[in-house]
A protein has these predicted regions:
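Glycine-rich phosphate- or other oxyanion-binding loops that anchor nucleotides, phosphorylated ligands
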Residues: 1-111
Length: 111
């Protein structure tokens, strides 16, 4: 499809503002330390939805994957770098659909 992609570990969390405004939280020191740890571990992104999908998939004994559309990068912003912001999720949907097609083809070929 010619899309720019990255593959790697993504952190799934339960609190949006804990990441984006950690200094406002009662456990700010803990949130800031964890964020530094995620960065040192080269985690690609942080999101809030996929953990539930992976848990349900495991409970149902089926496969699960995720494809993310990056809206903005807070580390680039902190460094004063340009943000290539886009809320158009069309590319992420296209990649996800193509990935599913390829998984189905591979499964059928293996039977």
């Amino acid at each position: 499809l010619g899309k720019r992609t990255q593959v790697g570990v993504v952190q799934c969390k339960d609190a949006f503002y804990g990441q984006h405004s950690p200094e406002r939280m009662p456990v700010s020191y803990e949130l800031l330390n964890k964020w530094e740890a995620w960065k040192r571990l080269h985690v690609k992104a942080s999101e809030m939805e996929s953990a539930a999908l992976f848990v349900v998939a495991d409970a149902l004994n089926c496969r699960c994957g995720s494809c993310f559309h990056v809206v903005w990068n807070q580390e680039r912003e902190k460094a004063g770098l340009d943000q290539d912001m886009s809320e158009d999720t069309t590319s992420a949907v296209q990649v996800g659909v193509e990935a599913l097609k390829r998984l189905i083809q591979a499964d059928r070929a293996a039977q």
